[in-house]
Structure formats: C-alpha cells, structure tokens
UniProtKB/Swiss-Prot annotation:
This is LPS-assembly protein LptD. Belongs to the LptD family. Coiled coil: none annotated. It comes from Aeromonas hydrophila subsp. hydrophila (strain ATCC 7966 / DSM 30187 / BCRC 13018 / CCUG 14551 / JCM 1027 / KCTC 2358 / NCIMB 9240 / NCTC 8049). HAMAP family: LPS_assembly_LptD. One of its GO terms (cellular component) is cell outer membrane.
Length: 810
C-alpha cells in the first residue's frame, strides 16, 4: 500500500467537476434538503438516504490537502502516473475510489476505470465503467453512472454524462430519475437526452417518457424543467378539474417573465359547459416598498346564459368578466402606507363567484369591497383616510352607503395616573344611485358626519389581584344630511315609526352631544387543587362594569354604517350596543361576570368557564330604526362560555346566549374534538335565531341550526380517510358533504375525493347543488396530475375548519 499527501489536487479533480454539473440537472425537483417529512413513512422510506456532510464553516473545500492511497503507484516514461488497486483519494469530506486511475502530466488527461465511487457530502456517484477528464479544459465523460442525492430521495442513472465548457454544459444520455426507494420503482422519468446549460434557468429533455412500473404512460418529445430558483417565459403545466356546474374545466397558463420585478401569467380556461375564458394576471414590484397586481377574467359568451334564469333575468347577454387591482406602497420608513383593493364584476352578475370561484377580491356579506386607503402612523398618533365603494352580489340586498371619503385621526397619551385617547372622524357618505336603480331600488339619504370623542381613563385601584378603572368620554357628532324625494321604499318603511306619523329623517344640520361614564373592575382569587392526577391551580375572577350614557332621540339621523352588535360574553362589557357611530344607545346598566380557570402543574389552561349578564336600571330607548318595536327588557341574555382540555386528545367548547325574558335560546355553539397524531375528528353545532335565509319562502328568514361532522384519520401506514358533513336541521338541506380516500407511499400518492355543495342562488335564493369529483395522482419530487385537491384538509368548499377552543397556549 502506497500513501502520499500531495500538494496538488489532480486526482480528486477528476470528479469534483461532477457535482456542480450534475446536481442541478437531477435535483431541480427536490433541493438538497432533508427528506420530505411524511410522518409514519419516514423510517420506512428514507433509511437508505445518506446524510449531507459539510466542512466546518469558513473552510474552503478546494484548499484542503489531498491524500491518495493505492496498492501500487507507477510513474511511466513521458510523465504518466498510474495508480492501481483500491485507489482512494480524500480531500476534506470528498471521497473518490476506483480500481485504476491514470494521469498524463503533459496532456493533463485523466482516466479512471472500474468501481468508480465519488462522494462529496452532497451527492454520491458510482460507475463500473470509465471516467475520462481533462484537468485544464475541465471536460469530462462518465459511462453508466448512478447517482444518489444526499438528504433527499432523488436518485437515478445515465448511460453517459458529458461535461464541457468548464462544467457549464452537461449532456446526459439515457438518463433516469426517480424518488422511489431501490427495488420499489413505481415511477421513473426516462429521457433519451438531457441538456443543461448552467447559465440558463431551464434544462431541456428530448424523447422523455414517464414510466409506471415497467410501462410507459406519458411521452414528451420535448420538455423543459427548472434548474434554478428563477423564472423564465414559457408554458406552465396545465390544470384540469371536473364539476357538475362547469363540466370539464381545463386551464393552460403561459408565463411571461417581463423583467426581474415584472411578470404576467396569461391563462386560457376552457369549460365545456360555458365556453372559453381568458385570464390575465400582471404583477409588479418596482422596489420592495411598492408591490401590486392586476387581474382580469373575461368570458365572452357563457353557454349557460339561455338555460339559467338567474343569468338571463339579470343580464342582457352572456358576457361575464371580473377585474381586480391590488396595490400596497410604503413611504417615510414605513410610517406612511397606501393600499388599494378593488374588485368588480359585471353589473347584476350576482352569481359570478358561485360559478367561477376566483381567488381574488374581498367579499363581506355578499358585497365586493372596493377600497383605497392611506395612513400615517406615529407612536402616539395616526391619521387614516379611506374611499370605499361596494358592489352587491345578492339581488335582494339593499345597496350600502359608501365612504367618499372617511378621515380618521387617533391620538394617545399615557401619563403616570391617566390614559388619554382622542378619536376624531370625518366621513362623507355617498350612495350609488345608478346601481340601486339597476336593482330596481330607489334613492337614499346621504350626508357628512363629523365625530370627535376625547376619552380619559383613570385607574382608581391597580393592585395584584384586583383593579378598578374609571373612564370619562364626551362624544360630539354633527351631521349634514340630505333626504331625496324618491327614497327607496325600504328606507321609507325603516324610518316610519310604528304609529305611522311619517318618515323621521331630518334634512340639514343635526348635532348630538352625549357624555359617557364607565366604571370597570375585577378581582382574581386563586387556590390550589389536586386535579388531573396532579397539582392544579384554580382561579375565580369576578368582574363588573357600570355604564351610564344619557338618552337622546336619534330617529332623525340616518343609519350609514351602524348595526346591532353580536351578543356574547365580551359584548356585555363593551361601552356600545351598536357597531358604528350613527346610534349611541342610552345606558344605565350594570354588567356582572364570573370566570373560573383551572391550570395544570405545567401552567397550561385546562378549563375555562364564564357566565355574565347585564341589568338595566332603565330599559334602553334608542333603536336602530324607528320602525322597530321598543324593547322593555331590563335584562340582557344570559351569556355562557366554556372550554375544556379534557386530556391530550379530547377538547370541548360550548357557548350560549339565553333570553331570560322570552325563555328561549338566542344563539348557541358547541364543539367536541378528538386529536391523536394524524387523527382529528370534530362534532360541532351552531344555532342563531333568525339568521338564515328561508330557502322555501323567498325574502323570509329562519333560524340557522346546523350540525357538522369532520374526520381525518389514517387507516394504516399508507391509507388515509377524510371527510366532512354539514346539515341544516331546520330546512333539511345538506349544506356540504365531502369524502376522500388517499393512498400515500414513499414516492407516489393517489387521492380520491367527492364533494356535494348546496349554496343558494343569489338571484332566486333557491338552493343549487354542485358536485365535484377529484382524482389526484402525485409523483413525489416530479409533480402531480389530476383533479381536485391532493391534501386531506378538513376544510370544505362552503365552510373552513375552525378550532373554537379559547384556552391559553392551545
């Protein structure tokens, strides 16, 4: 055995050139990262994958000394060095082995033969044939090579690998690529030739085919693929879905890399039941502080127009389109912000989102928001302005008032014994009369509102375990109001009191000044308990609030942005009965609440129970609309909330608001959830009185009374079952049903899912059913084809999965 330490790196350089050349070509679908986490499959799939090895930070791999071992070293005449028998070359973490290696000192040609092995800590290459290389030109050629990427299941082979131009150009002939474990090659990508130019973004493959087991299933005469995390103009992979509403739905996107900070995606979407839709998205970022996008969809003629009453009754033809603009800008070291969120569909196209499900736009209660905002923010003050309009997506909905604009100023100051806040707002409320007329609605009152409210908060007691705060507020509001003669009958009826004495709205200047006094306090008691088989800490937290606001009749003021607040535990300790500023309710009320929590010995909250109720000394007299019946109730609904972490698997939640005067539930919600590793199941229920559209009687409302069941569970190491079921109990309507089955192996998966969704038509308000079937086949590390989602999410098309448990650290 001969061992030498050399001052040059000739022998190791034979294969050093392989790494930068070969890696991008075969790793483009799976970067050099740890194997993908698949949970229970990890130990079964990836035990053969070698770990990534690196030198210590700061060390240069090329500067490390080279050690060569061989059974025999022979120096031939003419300057040729021959290494024979168990040749081993080491340089840092790099390793190179062969049976025979020959170096011509003059031509700088190198030949290695037999049992070739190369490992640089990131990739391993082996061959039983020949490696030829030149140390000056860096051109190399390897016959019948196999490769395995470290930290990744990516592996494969090539009949011949040729590297030229200082390793910038690589050609692989007879190449194969897979992420399947050895002996389990479910899929393999084979190509007659692959060319890589490392100065380019994409590699190119000719005569490529995808094989499943021993059978070719797809053939690509030519295909390109990314070798860098950069963008390039060209066709993207097509998409395909199938649904009962649109039928076969095929998308073919084309990507246009205009510049490093500008690009566009142009997509042709063919729906065999509707026609051809064009989609264009343009994205821009002139610098990191300014970013935005423009998006447009256009369907020239919807083939469903003549057959769909909700379309041909609302629009004159089948032309359908959507426009979306989104922009954000930051100025003055991010102190100033400007944002635009604008989405529009064709007028009276109420079902556009139901039919095409675009992934853009902000929808709030069947209204498309169109907003331009600007703000300037400092530590103790800020000023914001917003212009906001809406487009209605529900034929029977009343057109809302628009902000034209709103200017809002907030000031905060914290002293040693007080907190001062001052909110000032100026809003001009407009109304889209043209759209209202298009919806067969009349005009509406408009106005300008000025509101200012200084608020002084003084802590009276602030000790460990108890506190008492007092708050003083003075609210001044001024309206300049206009009331048209052709006002919508909806508004006329709302502002006509029960006695029928005529519309109460006043025109001109209206002022309102109201003081507010608030006293709020609470205490916390603790005791140690022996619960859950260990030490626990239980708290008892009583709290109270007294709120006084004098009465002032406000029936002459229009309702622009106000609505009744949702009733729950927390609303009982608010200083408002109405959201918005158009109605400030009188109040002479005491709210009392009691919360108890249990913490285990680790400090995790395991149980939270809370109950509260408010008592009015005088029933409030302010109403949202004069037509409403004045309530004489002096007690709020009794509010209850409870959460429990029963153990590491079981969680429970319940909440209810009980109307003690009418002896009935106002609302309730509950959930019971079981979680263990990848198994999640949840049974939930929600009830809200008079909060749902009556699908049998148009224009009427009924109770929302819905039960849901969700499940996702592994059946074994490979099979996974998931689904969701939502049922409207009062209307016997199955809101959403979804069931799926997924098979997941080391290198491929297949997912079947079937879903039925019932949503009301936004014109007829009749339920419409949508059925979709998804089949998703994924080759890990290569891509996926098919329809539907490849995940096992608990989300359904109609409702998202929510964990309603209000426990700390959960």
């Amino acid at each position: 055995m001969t061992k030498r330490t050399l001052g040059y790196s000739y022998p190791i350089a034979l294969t050093i050139s392989l790494v930068p050349a070969l890696t991008p070509a075969i790793v483009q679908a799976a970067p050099l990262t740890p194997p993908p986490a698949t949970g229970i499959l990890d130990g079964l799939c990836y035990d053969y994958v070698p770990k990534i090895e690196k030198l210590a930070p700061g060390k240069d791999a090329n500067a490390q000394p080279v050690e060569v071992d061989a059974d025999r070293l022979e120096a031939k005449q003419g300057g040729t060095a021959v290494y024979q028998g168990d040749v081993k070359v080491r340089q840092g973490v790099r390793k190179f082995d062969s049976d025979y290696a020959e170096l011509d000192q003059k031509s700088r040609d190198v030949i290695a033969i037999g049992n070739i092995y190369y490992n640089d800590g990131q990739i391993t290459v082996t061959s039983d044939k020949t490696l030829k290389s030149n140390l000056d030109t860096k051109n190399s050629e390897l016959e019948e090579g196999k490769y395995q990427v470290h930290g990744s299941p990516v592996r494969g082979s090539a009949d011949r690998v040729t590297m030229t131009n200082n390793n910038q150009n690589i050609t692989l002939e007879g190449a194969q690529y897979t992420t399947c474990p050895p002996g389990q090659e479910v899929w393999t990508l084979k190509a007659g030739s692959i060319d890589i130019d490392q100065t380019e973004v994409f590699g190119e493959a000719w005569n490529a085919s995808l094989w499943l087991y021993d059978y070719p299933v797809f053939y690509f005469p030519y295909i390109n693929f990314p070798i860098k995390d950069e963008r390039k103009t060209g066709l993207l992979y097509p998409g395909y879905t199938q649904s009962s509403k649109n039928g076969m739905d095929i998308t073919q996107p084309f990507y246009w890399n205009i510049a490093p900070n500008y690009d566009a995606t142009i997509t042709s979407r063919f729906m065999d039941r509707r026609g051809l839709m064009e989609q264009v998205q343009f994205r821009y970022m002139p610098d990191p502080a300014h970013v935005g996008s423009l998006y447009f969809e256009n369907l020239a003629n919807d083939k469903q127009y003549d057959e769909t009453p909700s379309l041909n009754q609302a629009m004159s033809d089948g032309h359908r389109y959507l426009l979306n603009a989104n922009h954000t800008s930051l100025f003055a070291d991010n102190a100033m912000r400007v944002s635009l969120d604008y989405t529009k569909v064709r007028d009276r196209d109420y079902n556009y989102f139901n039919d095409f499900s675009p992934k853009v736009g902000t929808q709030v209660e069947n209204q498309l928001q169109q907003s331009l905002m600007a703000g300037y923010f400092q530590p103790n003050w800020n000023i914001n302005t917003e212009v906001r309009t809406y487009q209605i997506l529900l034929a029977s909905a009343q057109q809302p008032h628009e902000l034209m604009p709103r200017i809002d100023h907030n000031y905060y100051q914290q002293g040693s014994w007080y907190d001062l806040a001052w909110n000032t707002e100026i809003t001009k409320f407009g109304y889209n009369n043209a759209q209202a007329i298009a919806q067969n609605q009349g005009g509406a009152y408009t106005g300008t509102r000025v509101y200012t409210a200084p608020t002084l908060t003084m802590p009276l007691i602030n000790e460990a375990g108890y506190y008492l705060d007092s708050q003083y507020k003075l609210m001044y509001t001024r309206y300049d109001q206009e009331v048209p003669d052709n006002m919508s009958q909806t508004f006329v009826s709302r502002f006509t009191p029960e006695n029928g004495n005529g519309v109460t709205l006043d025109e001109g200047i209206i002022t309102r000044t109201l003081p507010s006094f608030r006293l709020k306090g609470g205490m916390t008691f603790e005791r140690n308990q022996n619960w859950f088989g260990g030490d626990a800490n239980q708290t008892l937290e009583p709290e109270f609030q007294y709120l006084y606001v004098p009465y002032k009749n406000q029936d002459n003021i229009g309702v622009y942005d106000s609505t009744s607040m949702r009733q729950d535990y927390y609303s009982l300790f608010s200083d408002r009965r109405y959201a918005g500023l158009d109605r400030i309710s009188d109040s002479n009320r005491v709210s009392i609440g009691l919360t108890s929590r249990v913490y285990d010995e680790a400090g995790d909250e395991r149980i939270r129970l809370a109950v509260a109720q408010a008592f009015d000394f005088v029933a409030p007299r302010v109403k949202l609309y004069p037509s409403e019946t004045l309530t004489t109730n002096t007690r709020s609904p009794l509010s209850f909330e409870g959460d429990a972490k029963i153990n590491e698997q079981w969680f429970a939640h319940a909440g209810a608001q009980y109307d003690v005067d009418q002896s009935r539930l106002s609302s309730a919600n509950s959930a019971l959830e079981y979680r263990r590793e990848k198994l999640i199941s949840q049974l939930n229920h929600r009830f809200v009185r008079d909060a749902n559209y009556d699908l049998e009687n148009k224009g009427q409302v009924t109770d929302l009374n819905q039960i849901g069941l969700l499940l996702t569970t592994p059946l074994n190491d490979q099979w996974h079952l998931y689904g969701g079921y939502y049922q409207e109990l009062n209307q016997s309507v199955k809101s959403d049903r979804k069931v799926g089955l997924k098979y997941d192996s080391c290198c491929w998966s297949i997912n079947f899912n079937l879903e039925w969704v019932n949503t009301p038509d936004n014109v007829t308000m009749r339920p419409t059913s949508e059925r979709s079937l998804g089949i998703q086949f994924e080759m890990k590390g290569l891509g996926s084809v098919g329809t539907g989602s490849k995940g096992t999410s608990l989300d359904t098309e109609a409702l998202p999965y929510i964990r309603p448990f209000n426990l700390r650290d959960q």
